[in-house]
Amino acid sequence: MNMGMPMPSWYDIVGLDERSNEKCKGLAESRATVEGILQKEHDSTGLPFNRMILVGFSQGGALSLFTGLQFDQAIAGIIVLSGYLPAAKQCQPKHLNIPIWHGHGTMDPLVQFPMAQKTKETVEGLGVKSYTLESFPIPHTLSPAELQKMMQFLAKTLPPDDSCKIKLKDPKDMSIKELKAAIRKAGLGSKAVGLMEKSEFIKLVQDYRDGK
């Protein structure tokens, strides 16, 4: 791919043909990265794994499918946009009831539609019980109709649940490092100049959250 020249990617792609036998160099590392993000989100916000959905386009969709099926925790769902299942022979799903929605263009020249059909067949052959593949008359891109269908899947898979609202850590329970990170993220660096005591950092973060 890319005439043999390196380019940003989740893992190495050799060609555009059948990819189930590809080694996909870098795939395991990228999977670990995504799993780390999910775990960090859970640890920092308290958001349950069953309220998380992995979504990706093209190679990102492939990684989402490969990771979501094998993550130790059961997530709410997986959305694949113009993607496929890489390294299919290495994939060992841990949760067979995760709903998957796959949108794909019938005119896609990069990840051709037969590969999407093969992916659905392969994943179902691994025992996954809910895999929906929908086609759209588009190339390797997204369309309003596809996004609308995706939103319908999201609404069905993640209905409103106030009990699962993200819980922000109380500033009083934060370490100095966490307080400084929160201050940088909120763009409060100028207001933190000259502050020395932890109590001052706590007050700055708390006042910001309270809208003061």
Model-derived features with residue positions:
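Basic helix-extension-helix modules of the SAP/HeH family
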Residues: 162-212
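Short beta-strand/loop motif that positions the catalytic acidic residue
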Residues: 101-104, 108
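Primarily recognizes the serine-hydrolase "nucleophile elbow" in alpha/beta-hydrolase
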Residues: 49-96
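Post-His helix in hydrolase/transferase enzymes
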Residues: 142-156
